[in-house]
Each structure stands twice: as C-alpha cells, then as structure tokens.
Regions:
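Helix-rich interaction surfaces within compact, conserved domain-sized segments
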Residues: 76, 80-133
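Charged, amphipathic alpha-helical segments and their flanking helix caps
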Residues: 2-4, 64-87
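Short, solvent-exposed beta-alpha or beta-beta edge segments that form flexible loop/patches at the rim
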Residues: 26-48
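Beta-strand secondary-structure signal
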Residues: 17, 56-58, 93
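Small/polar-rich, solvent-exposed N-terminal microdomains that initiate assembly or binding
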Residues: 4-34
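Cysteine-cluster motifs in flexible loop/terminal segments that predominantly coordinate metals
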Residues: 120-156
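Residues at beta-strand starts and edge strands
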Residues: 14, 53-55, 90, 111
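Short glycine-rich, basic-tinged beta-strand/loop micro-motifs
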Residues: 51-64
Length: 156
C-alpha cells in the first residue's frame, strides 16, 4: 500500500490499529517511532543494478498503556516527514518487534491496518538457472475448453 493510500484511510477511521499476520492486534498503546525514507541500492545475482525506495514506519510498544495514537497525529507525523525528508508516494514497509524485528507490507480490512508477511524472491531467475514454473493443465480441462479440432474445422 502506498503512503497516499494510508493517509486517505487514516481520515476515515476513529482509531489507528494494526493487526499481525497471526490475527493478534498490536497493543493499542503502540507508538510510531519512525517514519522515513528507505532506499536500497544493490546488484542482484544476475548482475543487474537495482534501486528500491520505500517509506518505513516503525511501531514500538512501551509500558505506557494509557497512550493512544490518534489518526490525525499520525497524519501530522507523516506530513512532517514528507516535508522534511522529501518522502515520495512509495510503498510502505512496517517494522515491528516480535521475537526479532519483522518487516511487513501493509493492507487494510476496513477496520485495521494489516501487517502482511513479506517473502524473499530471486530477481534474476532467468540468469540464475532457476527453471520457470510451467502452468499445470489437466487433460480433462483441455477437452472441455472448446478449443478442440473437428473434422473440416481447419485447425490441422
């Protein structure tokens, strides 16, 4: 989800809440301790130079259980970051401390912002010898698709 989408959604909710991939909610007294620009410049295993840009949020939970981040306060933090750091409208990545620091994509279910698991992937499969996964088709599906040859149909 892009930063502009998060800002628009924040204007529609009464409270900010995040749900972990396992369904648990991040404690309501969380803090957003960072909003920043993340850049990653690297060479993939195929030798291609790549540049990525993300917006990073860091969530942190302290023992101040009376704290509650209001949607407008988060919008204010985001807008200050956009102004001072020249943050553009990139995808947002959220860091949250579990057993280690987890990095998540973000979604929204109408009530909660969803922390979505991220996956690693090879960016140069064509250069690494990784076979391209072929689409599996069952024979029964082929014959029922209507793309069969008939005598006089001109397909042969």
């Amino acid at each position: 989800m892009k930063l502009s989408q998060i800002k628009a959604l924040l204007k529609t909710v009464d409270r900010v809440s995040f749900k972990l991939p396992n369904g648990e909610l991040v404690p309501a007294h969380f803090h957003v301790t960072e909003v920043g620009k993340i850049t990653k410049n690297f060479i993939d295993c195929g030798g291609t130079i790549r540049n990525e840009a993300l917006v990073g949020f860091q969530l942190w939970t302290a023992n101040d259980t009376e704290h509650s981040l209001k949607p407008q306060k988060l919008i204010d933090i985001i807008e200050l970051s956009e102004e001072k750091l020249q943050i553009e409208d990139h995808e947002v990545e959220v860091e949250y401390q579990g057993t280690t620091i987890g990095k998540y994509g973000i979604g929204f279910d109408g009530t909660h912002f969803l922390l979505l698991n991220k996956q690693t992937d090879c960016l140069a499969k064509d250069n690494c010898g990784i076979p391209i996964e072929k689409q599996k088709v069952q024979l029964v599906d082929i014959s029922s698709s209507g793309n069969t040859c008939t005598p006089g149909g001109g397909c042969c």
